[in-house]
Design a protein with these regions (language model features):
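Conserved acidic carboxylate
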Residues: 7
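Acidic phosphotransfer microenvironment of two-component signaling modules
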Residues: 10, 32-36, 103
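Two-component/phosphorelay signaling modules centered on CheY-like receiver
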Residues: 10-29
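Acidic, metal-coordinating helix/loop segments flanking the phosphotransfer/catalytic sites
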Residues: 30-48
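Conserved phosphotransfer microenvironments
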Residues: 51-68
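Hydrophobic/aromatic residues positioned on beta-strands within the core alpha/beta folds
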Residues: 75-78
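C-terminal output helix
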Residues: 84, 100-113
């Protein structure tokens, strides 16, 4: 399954990428900002997205809205669960809390995406 990673912290994005690859997913890109995410979603048309709930202090609800409109599955990977869940679009998705384990994220990706 083709998966896009939306994450503003490089090391976390790389960890997510490793877990997705171990789950059998194909990573089609990594976006670190809202505009970059929206462009990559349109260009790559991933089957699924891991979505950080908060990019550089901004909730990613607009990206979740775009994903819903395109019927693209997503799960939220965030360290700010309570803040993230205040956005109804983000609250409807599966949530993986940071810090996460490699095994936990691999299992979640396999269950929800691959």
């Amino acid at each position: 399954m083709r998966v896009l990673i939306v994450e503003d912290e490089t090391m976390i994005a790389m960890t997510i990428e490793d877990a997705l690859l171990d789950a059998g997913c194909e990573v089609v890109g990594i976006a670190g900002t809202l505009p970059e995410a929206q462009i990559l979603i349109e260009r790559e048309r991933p089957a699924a997205v891991t979505l950080d709930g908060n990019l550089n202090g901004t909730l990613t609800g607009p990206v979740a809205k775009q994903l819903n409109e395109l019927a693209i599955r997503y799960m939220v990977v965030t360290g700010y669960v309570e803040l993230t869940l205040t956005d109804p679009l983000l609250a409807q998705a599966p949530v993986i809390q940071k810090p996460f384990t490699h095994q936990g994220l691999t299992r979640a990706a396999a269950q929800h995406f691959c």
